[in-house]
Amino acid sequence: MATILKQKLKTFFVPTAITLLLSACNSTSLFENSVTYLIKQEAYASSEFYINKAEQTLNSQDKITYQLLAVRKLIDENKVVEAQNTLNDLTTRLNIMEQNPLQQLEYQLVTAQLAALKGNNHQAEVTLQHISAANLSHSQLLRFYQTQAKIAENSKNTIEAVRIRSLIATQLVDNKLRQENNDKIWSLLRNANRGMLSSAQAGAGEMELAGWLALIEIYNQSVSTPAQMPQNINYWKRLYPNHSALAVMPTELQRVFNFQQTLLNNVALLLPLSGDAKILGEIIKKGFDDAKEQDPTIVQVFDTDSNSIENILMQAKQQGAQMIIGPLLKSRVNQMLASDQIRDINVLALNATQDVKPIVGVCYYGLSPEAEARSGADRLSRDGYTKAIVVAARDEFGQRSAEAFAQRWRQLTNTDADIRYYNQPLDVITTIQNSANNLQETALYALGNAEQLLEIKQGLENSTIAGQLAIYTASRSNSPNNGIEFRTAMEGVKFSEIPLLADHNSNEYQKAYSLADSDFSMMRLYAMGSDTWALANKFNEFRQIPGYSISGLTGNLNAGPNCNIERNMTWLQYHNGAVETTN
């Protein structure tokens, strides 16, 4: 594969029957009627348009051409099933395509594209080997390289994917396409393992790739000191004056040049300090105050249960607030997001609605089960598992967590997690046992409280698949009431937890333990208050510097999509009746 990826623009592949047929013709003009010629060009219409054209035409050759164009656009639109169905229909008429090498070539190309999209690398590679790059139009050649890049991405071979996309960059003239390609390259590099990137090297003459590797190295070295980022990137520009990113900078990096360090002198803290949620607001405020200590920043405190959100926002702004922190309750967050009062002020909401919307100047932070579930998916993938079974209680917590895990798992692996909901924990053991064929590289993410988790663990141990599944779970099962018997029964189970509760010897733990009367749920809220202060003081960094992170009491914090603060949590494991940190 590496040999194929490194071939230059005019390299020829092993001839096949198709290429022999093409080379036997002195000219392809025999096959280029006004419709067939479209195959060699960009396809600008929608898949629906080409499907309709295929249904309307009476000419068999034109029908095939329109179907090929439809498959191409269905792939672009990520409509895998529809693309495969249309391709299957075309396969039944290969005898007609044998009369038209242009259609044969396009058929091979879209077959490879679709195989790569579906993650079938072997089929995609074999099909590409049967295509001669010299016979491709410029539009087709770009798709040829994009398919190679997709194969590399499927294989988690970041450097090869970037190498191919660097080659694509030299072939693009449309600025929109150049921007999309550079954004994709940057996304691959930003999400790659830093150790792997540090050891990667470009080959002789690969200046485009060398430039990308140098740029990501500068970025990663500067991300913790964002104020130095523009100067360091300008230095990179002088080293690579002809690089494609110089003309079309990745979208993420464009924000870096407008970065201004966060400087606070007046903030408004909106919490429920009366009513049913008073106890929650008070412990969060205590964590916030303890983290702030003697900092001179003015903090205006507002009780969201004693006044309307609209009035509070107006008053806070009149009193000079630069930032709104809060509210905590979802209903209040929704009211705030609907207000025009937040259009010209930064906001750190302490909760997120189900469908977080991107709003300029707004970030979302909280101890949501979704954030922890996404962290769980990250952990299973990092530990090398390629298949995940999720068991969750059939309640709001279980459904929210399972759906968030599944969404992240799909992003990480391009496969679906096997989700199973239960009313009684033991119900799900039977279904897993009956459907278990091959559990290699499979892990179980079990969601529930301590009692439910215990039933699941013991049920698995008494089943025919005992010992075949690594078990992971979330912090909900971790309670100060879990004694030695529970910890012994949980042998080998790994669970996520906030850093505060992972280190019982820290001063922060001792303080929170005392304030919360040993209630882990309240201790988590104390930690949230502490991290809220830290986030507020680095608000611009999180908004404008992708990858910026800080270590907090609730996790390693970074900004995800729509400035939704993600938490990379500490992982612990039950071993010999105790709890220990796991790498």
UniProtKB/Swiss-Prot annotation:
A lipid is attached at residue 25 (N-palmitoyl cysteine). GO terms for biological process: peptidoglycan biosynthetic process; regulation of cell shape. Pfam families: LppC. Residues 1-24 form the signal peptide. Its main location: membrane. Keywords: Cell outer membrane, Cell shape, Lipoprotein, Membrane, Palmitate, Peptidoglycan synthesis, Signal. GO terms for molecular function: enzyme regulator activity. It comes from the Bacteria. The keyword Lipoprotein applies. Gene3D superfamilies: 1.25.40.650, 3.40.50.2300, Tetratricopeptide repeat domain. It is a lipid-anchor. Interacts with PBP1a. Belongs to the LpoA family. This is Penicillin-binding protein activator LpoA. It comes from Haemophilus ducreyi (strain 35000HP / ATCC 700724).
